[in-house]
Amino acid sequence: MSEDTALVVGLGNPGPQYEKTRHNVGFMVAGVLSARMGGKFSAHKKSGAEIVQGRLEGRPTILAKPRSFMNLSGSAVAGLARFFSVDPGNIVVIHDELDLDFGTIRLKQGGGEGGHNGLRSISQSLGTKDYLRTRVGIGRPPGRMDPASYVLKPFSSVERKELDLVCEESADAVELVLRLGLEAAQNRLH
């Protein structure tokens, strides 16, 4: 990818009651990336997000966590993109993915939102679906459990044992796409 500024957004819900839920895996990966950047999140009042500014893979990067609930995260993402003059093609959104087994990581650009209301909000606010996504698999709910309830539950004890590694590998995938671009990163990862 180019030296243009990248906007990397981890999706999640604010508040301690959501901190360890499946829906917040994007926030968890953003935490790993902020440590790698050597920065701490601070409020960016004009966008309604917390950000870290620095470099990832030598590239200028704005790392963000919207402070709104996930379903309303689009306004923060669009606000940051405008404020920092970041084109949608240089935005990477990290999110939970029901349609991937727990721990599976996939990169893609554009496409549908797959029922993910955070992605829908971002697509509507940006006016395009053409941004990069780092999809972190959380698996399907067991039995007849409602997916909306499932994503707001904490990871299982078995999953928690693997969660740190999954977050590290997801952060690696973000760095890979920033360094190599989507196609080369997909070839390495998938």
From Swiss-Prot:
Site Stabilizes the basic form of H active site to accept a proton: give positions.
D96
Q: What class of enzyme is it?
A: hydrolase
Q: What is its main location?
A: cytoplasm
Q: Does the keyword Cytoplasm apply?
A: yes
CC annotations in GO: cytoplasm
Q: Which Gene3D superfamilies match?
A: Peptidyl-tRNA hydrolase
Marked site: Discriminates between blocked and unblocked aminoacyl-tRNA? N13
User: Its Gene Ontology molecular function terms?
Assistant: peptidyl-tRNA hydrolase activity; tRNA binding
Matching entries from InterPro entries are given as: Pept_tRNA_hydro, Pept_tRNA_hydro_CS, Pept_tRNA_hydro_sf
Q: Which reaction does this enzyme catalyse, per its entry?
A: an N-acyl-L-alpha-aminoacyl-tRNA + H2O = an N-acyl-L-amino acid + a tRNA + H(+)
Enzyme nomenclature, EC number: 3.1.1.29
Residues that coordinate or bind tRNA: Y18, F69, N71, N117
Any idea which residues are catalytic in this one?
Answer: H23 (proton acceptor)
Q: Name one Pfam family in it.
A: Pept_tRNA_hydro
tRNA-binding as a keyword of this entry, yes or no, is yes
Q: What does the UniProt entry say about where the protein is found?
A: Cytoplasm
Q: Which UniProt keywords apply?
A: Cytoplasm, Hydrolase, RNA-binding, tRNA-binding
Q: Name one GO biological process term.
A: rescue of stalled ribosome
**Role noted for this protein:** Hydrolyzes ribosome-free peptidyl-tRNAs (with 1 or more amino acids incorporated), which drop off the ribosome during protein synthesis, or as a result of ribosome stalling.
Q: How does it assemble?
A: Monomer.
Family affiliation? Belongs to the PTH family.
Quote the protein name from its UniProt record. Peptidyl-tRNA hydrolase
